[in-house]
From Swiss-Prot:
Hormone produced in response to various stresses to confer information about those stresses to the brain, and trigger an aversive response, characterized by nausea and/or loss of appetite. The aversive response is both required to reduce continuing exposure to those stresses at the time of exposure and to promote avoidance behavior in the future. Acts by binding to its receptor, GFRAL, activating GFRAL-expressing neurons localized in the area postrema and nucleus tractus solitarius of the brainstem. This is Growth/differentiation factor 15. The gene is Gdf15. It comes from Mus musculus. Disruption phenotype: Mutants weight more, have increases adiposity associated with increased spontaneous food intake and exhibit reduced basal energy expenditure and physical activity. Female mutants exhibit some additional alterations in reduced basal energy expenditure and physical activity. Mutants mice on high fat diet develop obesity compared to wild-type mice. Mice also show progressive postnatal loss of spinal, facial and trigeminal motoneurons. At behavioral level, they exhibit a task-dependent increase in locomotion and exploration and reduced anxiety-related behaviors across tests. It comes from the Eukaryota. The keyword Ligase does not apply.
Amino acid sequence: MAPPALQAQPPGGSQLRFLLFLLLLLLLLSWPSQGDALAMPEQRPSGPESQLNADELRGRFQDLLSRLHANQSREDSNSEPSPDPAVRILSPEVRLGSHGQLLLRVNRASLSQGLPEAYRVHRALLLLTPTARPWDITRPLKRALSLRGPRAPALRLRLTPPPDLAMLPSGGTQLELRLRVAAGRGRRSAHAHPRDSCPLGPGRCCHLETVQATLEDLGWSDWVLSPRQLQLSMCVGECPHLYRSANTHAQIKARLHGLQPDKVPAPCCVPSSYTPVVLMHRTDSGVSLQTYDDLVARGCHCA
């Protein structure tokens, strides 16, 4: 069976490259100089000076793979990535006030619905019409959010538009919010709160799920030598409205699916990042090592 068409790329990180270099050097020094690279042991010289056979090489490879995984785990624990930024598209209430000002009303709960408390507004852009230039209202919105006192269910902003945006608001006004985890709170909050709260119940929304599979399960036993068993992280679960949206396109897709489910499919749970996997496999010339960067999922989102 021919190997699947996967893109093979070198892994990142100096430690990983150095260890792979050592293993390649071991293969060059220990592999037979003539004949088939996968020749049977009886075809090689016997005695303490004999060449390493395939089983011994597999053992060395498994040991190296264990050390690579240990190094990767230490790197992950020491440099945990920040949670992904989030985007919200809202439809605020806008009306014309006195002296050419615009009165904007936004539901406070909709600003960070479905996100942990650590998320804060990073930027706010108001589009009065679909063709209008975005109007940055980050400062007045943050100022309204920082006011102390009783928290009203809605934020009310009185805005003076720039001259080139002096126009009557239309029914298509949109507010685009870009949210990030507040500085200094990301790691603690990421552990204290789940990234998203699934409205369908625990375990039903888009998430990672690990499945163990052998080379025989995958149909790879005729060309892959090591590892003999893989832990494959898969993205499974449903994508309810605005849950873990990958981007603005995914949010629009979710909205249109709610309006026209027969024409627009719902967003799907797909990988957002991957963990590199090293495979030792047979080639026409012997044995080769390849790193597959798009085989095992590391994170999931809806797209």
